[in-house]
């Protein structure tokens, strides 16, 4: 604990303050306020964090001692005030609980009841956040024996006031000779850590990590020290060096990592004004600035700060693994004779764990740095790596240099790992964990811990990359065939599966460099393939996959898949079935690895539709594109067959169809054409809009709900419809809008409920939607107001300037308006309102929500049903959209991009 520091607490001055005041509370509060201000100023000036949190604990010691002395405990009283937990370690952050144990000699508390109650009341009155317990020595023993948390807390204790003999007796009766022997304690603590890690999804890379509890956080360091304390009676990192569990460099790294997390935690408490261990988005930017990070041309300050954070916790996790493995070998020795199984001259198994056969293996044969991972992939029964071998791996990383990277033995071993029938993902993770992967592939090293500061990418780039490879491996499992039927079928027939894993490893390798990461990554992928002696065709395929890994997802979500030209253009890009197969599988894995919430039946079916239509185009031959007239005839013939079977007159159907135009038949299936036609012909001609709702049968929108609206066209049709749907808590995924020559609108919307599920066959919900839409369309003057809902905290934090792009599609004679904006409740209704103000008609729309942002595409025309040709109109439209979508945004706007 620190020496006396009068600037923090001056006993003489404090006693004088007490004498001047009628109530002691004001003097105590002033003293607390003073040391808090001094410590916060010292923190802001960059003082040593270890000293700061120890100084805070010392200050609280002084306050407690002064408070304790105000009560009559009796002469030679057997009562002791003990600091426990983190405060017992002498570590205290600004708003951490002050954990106290009032320790008694006997269970008879009656003689001390009044002073104890007065003491605790005073602590609460002066503003100390106290967690307290009152126990006898025997009660401590009983509760510690039954509760892992209690024994852990009692292991870290200091006497603040009263005789220390009581604390010593308590430590003696709760020692490992009486309860929780080191083996039992180790197993319980290891299980506790596993449960805690599972709570945080077993990853260091959560978007809003908990600096205390998340994997790699402060609790992982404390867990190591608790285990050491129970085994050796020591409770600091240097003791682990003396016991041979750490080397000096590892001890220094753990200490500096702990201090970094302490600084982050201190800053969190200071910024939040309360105990806060979650590194929330609200605080990440503030702490980045506080720590001196600045934006540059490539990365935001917050991204650089978070990369530092993730690399620190990754390093802590790595050493936590190493030390716990070492503890396991020491504390849990095998009761059976040691089983040694040679693998080759360099490696052997000891009780199922792989280890080197001698300490100089890596020095004499550096290729063994890669060979060990290939062996583990080839022998999935291997439980893990022995602690000494993990340390040798870490200490031998410097042997991986340019000469090593170009040695054919090493390049061959690395490719061999990708050809393994199992264990690819597991051993790439191990390589990353032990620092080998980033050393062997420096370009991978650059993306370790790199976070993209948004809600769309919920993992760092390296974690996302390894998750993608994990997902590719999962597609090979039979149990995945139900959820991913097409991808599972395709991956089984890929001629060279190793190529998809290499493409997955490199698809985001150039993130964070500036420029187009797909283009830059393709160059890196090509260089990798060439240096690893892959044939030219394989090299071209991998490089092409990296360069185009976003194209299939973008096409499926933002283009009209019913347009034959869209399919033809995509088929031209793909070129052949092999490229299509590889790209489809990579895209499925990429979406799932980016953010699990992104993958739903709607996105799945979009991709499947694009794959199927492109496959047909390739089989037909790119020189034989789809004939629009033939496609229309096929749709009409199939629809007519259904209608005639249902008793609909052919002439009536064809009369209606003559008013609908070609686009209607290109953008709807025969089944939907028949459904619409029968309902329209049977609908009374009384001006009431026709609203049909069902689960969609379209392959690209399975599990969505289809809403079909047929009504007299009106200029506010789209605006009123989307506003009404917003009020009905519907999320629009796709819109297909047709205006007939008789001035009737035929709109089809694919929707999900706001929670992402389909409406299903719920009669009450369907009736509510139908009635709500009919009422809105019958009374357009009562245009539904936009619902003002609370913007979620995370969305508020990721506000950015809306971007609006307007271009002209000369072939289809429409303007294409693309909106990229922060997601907000009622956003589509706001856009519809702007279209209404500008007298614009929406011909088609593609809706995509990606994390905190929406990327919507609208195909629009002016009042004369022509593309927007007036630059001034486009600028005013853009300005209006940006202003509307910037509400509650707090960001500057971006100029439009208009292409005619």
UniProtKB/Swiss-Prot annotation:
Gene3D superfamilies: Beta Polymerase, domain 2 (3.30.460.10), cca-adding enzyme, domain 2 (1.10.3090.10), Nucleotidyltransferases domain 2 (1.20.120.330)
Gene Ontology terms describing biological process: regulation of nitrogen utilization
Keywords of this entry: Hydrolase, Magnesium, Multifunctional enzyme, Nucleotidyltransferase, Repeat, Transferase
Region feature Uridylyltransferase, mapped onto this chain: 1-342
Domain ACT as annotated: residue spans: 706-789, 816-891
Activity regulation details: Uridylyltransferase (UTase) activity is inhibited by glutamine, while glutamine activates uridylyl-removing (UR) activity.
One Pfam family linked to the record: NTP_transf_2
Record carries keyword Transferase: yes
PANTHER family per the UniProt record, alphabetical: BIFUNCTIONAL URIDYLYLTRANSFERASE/URIDYLYL-REMOVING ENZYME, BIFUNCTIONAL URIDYLYLTRANSFERASE_URIDYLYL-REMOVING ENZYME
Protein name: Bifunctional uridylyltransferase/uridylyl-removing enzyme
Species this protein is from: Pseudomonas aeruginosa (strain UCBPP-PA14)
Gene behind the chain: glnD
């Amino acid at each position: 604990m620190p020496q006396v520091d009068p600037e923090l607490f001056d006993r003489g001055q404090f006693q004088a303050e007490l004498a001047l005041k009628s109530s002691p509370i004001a003097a105590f509060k002033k003293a607390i306020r003073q040391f808090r201000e001094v410590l916060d100023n010292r923190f802001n000036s960059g003082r040593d964090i270890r000293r700061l949190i120890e100084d805070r604990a010392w200050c609280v010691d002084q306050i407690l001692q002064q408070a304790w002395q105000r009560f009559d405990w009796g002469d030679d009283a057997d009562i002791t005030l003990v600091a426990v937990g983190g405060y017992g370690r002498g570590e205290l952050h600004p708003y951490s609980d002050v954990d106290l144990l009032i320790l008694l000699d006997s269970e008879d508390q009656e003689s001390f009841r009044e002073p104890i109650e007065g003491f605790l009341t005073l602590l609460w009155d002066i503003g100390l956040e106290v967690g307290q317990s009152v126990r006898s020595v025997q009660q401590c023993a009983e509760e510690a024996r039954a509760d892992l948390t209690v024994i852990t807390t009692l292991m870290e204790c200091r006497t603040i006031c009263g005789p220390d003999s009581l604390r010593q007796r308590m430590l003696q009766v709760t020692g490992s000779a009486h309860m929780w022997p080191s083996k039992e304690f180790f197993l319980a603590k290891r299980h506790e850590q596993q449960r805690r890690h599972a709570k945080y999804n077993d990853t260091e890379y959560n978007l809003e990590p908990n600096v205390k509890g998340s994997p790699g956080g402060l609790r992982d360091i404390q867990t190591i020290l608790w285990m050491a304390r129970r085994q050796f009676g020591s409770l600091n990192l240097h003791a682990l060096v003396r016991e041979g569990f750490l080397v000096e460099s590892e001890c220094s790294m753990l200490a500096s990592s702990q201090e970094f997390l302490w600084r982050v935690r201190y800053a969190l408490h200071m910024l939040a004004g309360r105990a806060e261990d979650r590194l929330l988005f609200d605080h990440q930017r503030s702490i980045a600035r506080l720590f001196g990070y600045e934006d540059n041309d490539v990365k935001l300050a917050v991204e650089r700060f978070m990369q530092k954070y993730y690399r620190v916790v990754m390093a802590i996790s790595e050493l936590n693994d190493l030390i716990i493995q070492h503890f396991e070998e020491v504390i849990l020795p095998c009761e059976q004779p040691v089983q040694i199984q040679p693998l080759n001259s360099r490696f052997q198994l000891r009780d199922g764990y792989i280890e080197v056969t001698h300490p100089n293996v890596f020095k004499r044969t550096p290729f063994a740095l890669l060979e060990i991972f290939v062996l583990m992939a080839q022998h999935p029964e291997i439980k893990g790596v022995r602690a000494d071998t993990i340390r040798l791996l870490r200490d031998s990383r410097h042997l991986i240099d340019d000469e090593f990277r170009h040695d054919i033995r090493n390049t061959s071993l690395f490719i061999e790992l990708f050809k393994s029938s199992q264990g690819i993902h597991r051993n790439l993770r191990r390589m990353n964990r032990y620092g080998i992967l980033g050393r062997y592939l420096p370009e991978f090293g650059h993306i370790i811990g790199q976070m993209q500061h948004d809600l769309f990418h919920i993992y760092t780039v390296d974690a996302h990359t390894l998750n993608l490879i994990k997902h590719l491996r999962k597609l090979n499992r039979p149990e995945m065939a139900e959820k991913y039927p097409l991808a599972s079928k395709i991956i089984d027939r890929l001629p060279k599966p190793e190529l998809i894993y290499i493409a997955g490893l490199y698809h985001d390798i150039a993130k964070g460099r500036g420029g187009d990461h797909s283009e830059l990554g393709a160059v890196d992928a090509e260089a990798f393939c060439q240096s690893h002696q892959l044939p030219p065709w394989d090299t071209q395929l991998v490089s092409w996959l990296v360069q185009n890994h976003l194209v299939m997802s973008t096409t499926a979500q933002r283009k009209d898949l019913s347009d034959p030209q869209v399919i033809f253009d995509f088929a031209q890009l793909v070129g052949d079935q092999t490229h299509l197969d590889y790209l489809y599988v990579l895209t499925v894995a990429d979406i799932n690895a980016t953010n699990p919430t992104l993958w739903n039946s709607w996105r799945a079916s979009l991709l499947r539709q694009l794959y199927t239509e492109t496959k047909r185009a390739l089989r037909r031959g790119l020189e034989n594109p789809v004939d629009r007239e033939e496609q229309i005839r096929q749709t009409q013939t199939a629809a007519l067959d259904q209608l005639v079977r249902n008793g609909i007159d052919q002439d009536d159907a064809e009369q209606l169809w003559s008013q609908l135009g070609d686009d209607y038949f290109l953008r709807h299936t025969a089944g939907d054409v028949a459904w619409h036609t029968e309902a329209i012909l049977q609908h009374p001609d009384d001006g009431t809009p026709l609203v049909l709702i069902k689960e969609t049968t379209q392959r690209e929108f399975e599990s969505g709900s289809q809403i079909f609206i047929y009504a007299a066209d009106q200029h506010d049709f789209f605006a009123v419809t989307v506003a009404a749907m917003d009020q009905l808590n519907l999320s629009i995924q796709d819109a297909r809008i047709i205006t007939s020559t008789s001035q009737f609108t035929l709109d089809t919307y694919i929707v999900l409920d706001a929670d992402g599920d389909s409406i299903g066959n719920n009669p009450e919900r369907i009736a509510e939607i139908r009635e709500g839409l009919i009422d809105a369309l019958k009374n357009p003057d009562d245009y539904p107001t936009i619902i003002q809902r609370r913007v979620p905290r995370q969305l508020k934090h990721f506000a950015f300037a809306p971007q609006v792009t307007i271009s002209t599609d000369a072939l289809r004679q429409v303007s294409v308006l693309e909106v990229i904006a922060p997601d907000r409740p009622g956003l589509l209704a706001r856009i519809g309102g702007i279209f209404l103000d500008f007298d614009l008609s929406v011909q088609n729309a593609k809706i995509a929500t990606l994390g905190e942002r929406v990327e919507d595409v609208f195909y629009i025309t002016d009042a004369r049903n022509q593309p927007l040709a007036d630059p001034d109109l486009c600028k005013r439209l853009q300005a209006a959209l940006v202003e509307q979508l910037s509400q509650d945004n707090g960001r500057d706007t971006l100029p439009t991009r208009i292409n005619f």
